[in-house]
């Protein structure tokens, strides 16, 4: 019965087809909301007719009666196609969920799937996984599956997802097909995806001089079509999980200027001084491993603007990406504390060597390898393990509970 239940929830136990690009994510409070979204169009099932939206049935796992949730749909960006849009993005949004509760849902007559709302208190250990720089490769699929096999509450990916560069819609769709296949955890639960932005989400990669937020959003059409519900404003995002975890999702100069976010970072770190586990995440590293400290202006700016603010705060650690290898450094501490920086993004891409002399002096761990960070939070402390492609442990750091 246990095996049958797993097959059913992973889409192998009954007729019908789960959308090939099914993504669960959050646009609001992770403890009480959930968003499911998927694409319809060529190769992905018929686009919904006007007035005939897809219907989702859902219920708590233990409940006897199913409820009905109506979906909404919008055109999905299709930059290479002149004329009719080929794909449509369909969404189902749940509100007022119970924290730390499992729910079943069924899209049309497709197999039943399961999700879990986030707990609002840290009464038992919580795991999430983290990485960046993925691409659409066999190694990318392997690394995402490895992350999901850890049975995490969610996966956070800090930019450079599909390498679609804001224009290659076919590549973008292939990436989400790959994620959808990987996203079923060992117990049949679909793992939510928390996305950060990198240069390969944006046409041109970085903020254009004089461009407005609205103009830059248009240069990252897929990212904002999928995740604009979370990134609504011209500022970073703070994703809060009850009273125990906060993720500060920054933009390292891709749509938002770096300097425009410094005051936000300072204020939001101050607001979360009582939160035991606070992580900041962005794409371009403050402490590169393949590039040098002055290789590009964004590296210099995030190090000059944000590192002193973080060193003067109670932040637990920082996740960086962009340089395609595993490197952990401790910041120099001139702003107050030495902060661990976990980088630098290799969740499927071809790993690069460590050749930054400035960062090597601060380096605590390095591997020219793909990796995924597995973060376990407990009442008495936290552990971050970095796993290589075969699940081998490449690095491990133990954190005592924040005493503040």
Segments from the language model and where they lie:
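Bacterial N-terminal signal peptides
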Residues: 1-11
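Acidic, histidine-bearing metal-coordination/catalytic regions of metal-dependent phosphoesterases
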Residues: 14-130, 149, 368, 374-404
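Acidic/histidine-rich helix-loop elements
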Residues: 49, 65-89, 125-140, 165-166, ...
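Extended active-site neighborhood of metal-dependent phosphoesterases/phosphodiesterases
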Residues: 88-93, 99-116, 171-277, 293-297, ...
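An acidic-aromatic substrate-binding cleft motif
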Residues: 110-165, 169
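Mobile, glycine- and charge-enriched loop segments
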Residues: 119-135, 261-300, 394
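Residue-level marker for buried hydrophobic side chains located in beta-strands
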Residues: 128-130, 155-157, 195-196, 280, ...
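Active-site glycine-centered loops adjacent to acidic/histidine catalytic or metal-binding residues
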Residues: 133, 159-160, 198-199, 250, ...
């Amino acid at each position: 019965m246990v095996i049958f239940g797993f097959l059913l929830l992973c889409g192998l136990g009954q007729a019908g087809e789960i959308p090939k690009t099914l993504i669960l994510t959050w646009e609001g409070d992770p403890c009480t909301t959930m968003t499911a979204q998927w694409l319809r169009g060529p190769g992905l099932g018929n686009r919904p007719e006007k007035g005939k939206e897809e219907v989702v049935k859902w219920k708590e796992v233990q409940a006897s009666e199913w409820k009905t949730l109506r979906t909404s749909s919008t055109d999905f960006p299709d930059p290479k196609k002149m004329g009719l849009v080929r794909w449509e993005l369909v969404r189902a949004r749940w509100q007022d969920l119970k924290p730390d509760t499992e729910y079943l849902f069924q899209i049309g007559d497709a197999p039943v799937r399961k999700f879990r709302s986030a707990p609002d208190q840290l009464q038992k250990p919580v795991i999430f996984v983290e990485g960046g720089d993925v691409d659409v490769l066999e190694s990318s699929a392997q690394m995402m599956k490895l992350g999901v096999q850890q049975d995490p509450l969610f996966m956070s990916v800090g930019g450079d997802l599909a390498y679609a560069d804001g224009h290659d819609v076919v590549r973008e769709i292939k990436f989400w097909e790959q994620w959808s296949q990987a996203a079923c955890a060992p117990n049949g639960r679909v793992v939510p995806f928390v996305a950060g932005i990198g240069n390969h989400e944006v046409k041109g990669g970085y903020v254009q001089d004089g461009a407005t937020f609205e103009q830059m959003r248009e240069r990252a059409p897929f990212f904002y079509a999928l995740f604009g519900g979370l990134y609504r404003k011209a500022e970073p995002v703070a994703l809060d999980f009850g009273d125990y975890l906060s993720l500060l999702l920054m933009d390292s100069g891709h749509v938002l200027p770096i300097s425009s976010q410094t005051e936000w970072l300072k204020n939001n770190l101050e607001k979360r001084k009582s939160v035991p586990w606070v992580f900041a995440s962005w794409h371009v590293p403050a402490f590169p491993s393949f590039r040098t400290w002055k290789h590009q202006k964004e590296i210099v700016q995030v190090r000059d603007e944000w590192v002193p603010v973080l060193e003067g705060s109670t932040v637990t650690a920082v996740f960086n990406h962009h340089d395609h290898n595993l490197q952990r450094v401790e910041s120099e501490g001139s702003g107050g504390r030495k902060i661990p920086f976990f980088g630098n993004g290799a969740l499927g891409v071809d790993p690069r060597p460590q050749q930054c002399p400035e960062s090597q002096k601060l380096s605590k761990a390095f591997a020219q390898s793909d990796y995924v960070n597995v973060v376990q939070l407990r009442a008495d402390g936290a552990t971050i393990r970095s796993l290589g492609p075969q699940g081998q442990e490449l690095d491990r750091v133990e954190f005592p509970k924040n005493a503040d």
